[in-house]
Amino acid sequence: MSVPRIDGETSLVGLIGHPVSHSLSPQMHNASFAALGLNYVYVPLDVPPEELEAGVRGLRALGFRGFNVTMPHKERVCALVDRLDEAARISGAVNTVAVEEDGSLLGMNTDGSGFLLACREAGVEPSGRVALVAGAGGAAAAVAVALLRAGLSELRIANRTPGRALGLRERLGGLGGRVEVFPLSGLAEAAGGADILVNATYLGMRAGDPLPFPEELLRPGVAVCDAVYRPGKSTALVRAARRRGLAAVPGELMLLYQGVEAQRAWTGVDPDVGAMRRALSGEG
């Protein structure tokens, strides 16, 4: 990938989170900008929680065209933008912000649509199926919205704090499909009869993390999706699923497709998906 051209006309986009040093988003987006000849640059910005409000104000003041939002800021950013798209409003989480022509901030959620595109590339179709999502934070909420919109028959949410999962279930009302809540201690019960297992927790970000789903739950015919990715290697969950011959949707694929949707919102141009994919695989 060539070094981005930076001059007085360069449009700025980026990523805010804490931490951001592990992120592959800069490589991915800058590869597409270079391939398309767009005068944009994407920069990672480590913004601690206590500086989030000031950080968002600063990005607007500095003329950024948009930015991604990652953990732990996805939910708090909802209150810092001017309006939300439907996916962000229902999920209560923002992963992409676009600066509109009048300078207002549109909070979007492309995690869910990216998740669905990744599933379908891997041959996983949610319609009419039963899915178990571990986690009830921003990523889990976006995935839940996307699954129900895609015709899922039953969604099960397992979370360490049941109150948060119950709040998510309430927000999902009206999207169709049955929604049940389980404590993490009831993970085995929740997984019974599930066709799709989705990890939307932090587990897997660090080497040595326990599997979010015990190996005995990785039954024949189950599809496994991991929202977590580790630069340069598959997560333990994805490796375990593949060893058993199961369909596995890695976090890198979800990252790719949510990024495609985000970049299109910033530039109004279809991204170079091939360049983005090569950058994620280390070939760019």
From Swiss-Prot:
InterPro entries: Aminoacid_DH-like_N_sf (IPR046346), NAD(P)-bd_dom_sf (IPR036291), SDH_C (IPR041121), Shikimate_DH (IPR011342), Shikimate_DH-bd_N (IPR013708), Shikimate_DH_fam (IPR022893), Shikm_DH/Glu-tRNA_Rdtase (IPR006151). The active site is at 74 (proton acceptor). Its EC number is 1.1.1.25. GO terms for molecular function: NADP binding; shikimate 3-dehydrogenase (NADP+) activity. It holds the Pfam family SDH_C. Homodimer. Involved in the biosynthesis of the chorismate, which leads to the biosynthesis of aromatic amino acids. Catalyzes the reversible NADPH linked reduction of 3-dehydroshikimate (DHSA) to yield shikimate (SA). This is Shikimate dehydrogenase (NADP(+)). It comes from Rubrobacter xylanophilus (strain DSM 9941 / JCM 11954 / NBRC 16129 / PRD-1). The lineage of its organism: Bacteria, Bacillati, Actinomycetota, Rubrobacteria, Rubrobacterales.
